[in-house]
Amino acid sequence: MVEIVSAHTDLRRQGVRYTGLCPFHDERSPSFSVQSEEKLYHCFGCGVGGDLFDFVIAIENVDFPTAVESLAERYGVEVKREDEDPQAEERRKARQRLTELMERTASFYSSFFGDAPEAAKAREYLAGRGLGEEILKDFGVGFAPSAWDTLLIKGQQAGYSIPELLRTGLAQKNNKGGVYDRFRARITFPIRDARGRVVGFGARATRDEQKPKYLNSAEGELFHKSEILYGIDRARGPMAKAGRAVVVEGYTDVIALHQAGFTEAVGVMGTSITEAQIAMLSATVDTIVLALDADAAGRKAMLRAQQVAAGRSLRILVVAMPAGVDPAEIATAEGGAETFRELVDAAVELPEFHIELVLAEVDPNSPQSRDKVLGDA
């Protein structure tokens, strides 16, 4: 239990128990206690408590069956399922093999990033962006070798078939039917679902001739970009504690903000926020802070959030990001954590942001301006 809880708050041993700051409410003095032998937790500040299952249910905002499956997967325990028909069991086990393949691939990419001479420029690039080794390791950032068949060979050597490699999106076919690695000579960011399972990868180019600059896993059995948020596995607990989610665009934005202490940050992996992503956030928080880039695409995405969140009891705030600067650049600069905190504190309600956008785009001396403002706002 100590291992599970330690992923959400720092614990210090005091005899037979461990103490730390409560992950469920803000406090300055530790009032959260874990009894390691009894496998129980209790907070003397807010009163929450229970066993390991209660903790997972509360911190991850899931039901009991999901908590059981999450813990079983973490510790490699197979959960017996009564009355499961053979076909359903076969599908479940086949999917489990795919997630295991993705996890092994993430580990391989991470090790290659840390050790391989070929990844030296990638390490230099991320260090130059102000991202430390510890946070990169925490997020499992890796590097895909430049060879066309490294993963194909390693995957088959580990007992996985080419169809399985294709189903995960780790391999793809060319127009002649040949199969090759999808990610090559790219920085890799493992994308995990809310339960911490690797379902896909984002991959950044390291060479000028590589297009596109960012390449995601193909949509498939495991990966559905519109239904996942980068960093959600790490951010859900902090989100619940803070009562808000900070939503940014890219992988490095999320990593940099977590490094700066904004562990409630998640990424939409692009500019568009979807109904599924809004639903995922609203299950945990009642406030969403949008910190998207201050370009046309970012502004459009922020306005779209207003549409997809319609009908939900959500408060949506918009951070006025400086032009030409992304959250990662702010967070990794000297004094960046305080600068970003000030930007978040100054965030405006989404309807107010919408009106400000409309006013900025019209000529105040034009007789048509009033009609445009009233029509668009």
Predicted regions and their residues:
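Conserved active-site segments centered on acidic
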Residues: 66-121
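Structured, non-catalytic alpha/beta "coupling" segments that mediate domain-domain communication
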Residues: 58-77, 185-205, 329, 333, ...
